[in-house]
Amino acid sequence: MPVPANAIEAVFLTHAHIDHSGMLPKLCKDGFRGQIYATEATCNLCRIMLMDSAHIQESEAQWRTRKAERAGERAVEPVYDTNDAAAALRLLRPCQYNAAVQAAEGIIIRMTDIGHLLGSACIEVWLREDGVTKKLVFSGDVGNVNQPILRD
């Protein structure tokens, strides 16, 4: 990542799919200590998915290490482990849809339902600095054609 993990103050997670959430434990392993903002449903899904992913990482690394050692090569380390996943989970901050949340000094966010997955959100971010407010919007993935979602 081009920015040191310990220089990041907050992460805004649009949904739990592993291509969006899967490297959060690695971010923590690398020094991230900020907050991870997501909807409550996304937080709940991440609690399952990130621990499962960490177990897979550990098992895969053990298997590759056994194979590598037979070939006289170095042990393989997992990208992250269950301790890293647990660290990421402790940083999750559940947000309600349509509620304004102060994420940091001068930063307010609001998550709105975007219909992609249970708990998915479009994230509006208001940045206030020197009396000027700017609005940014992160869409994440949008919609899910012909796949109704039961509201959380």
Over which residues does each language-model region extend?
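His/Asp/Glu-rich metal-coordinating catalytic cores
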Residues: M1-F12, H17-S21, L27-D152
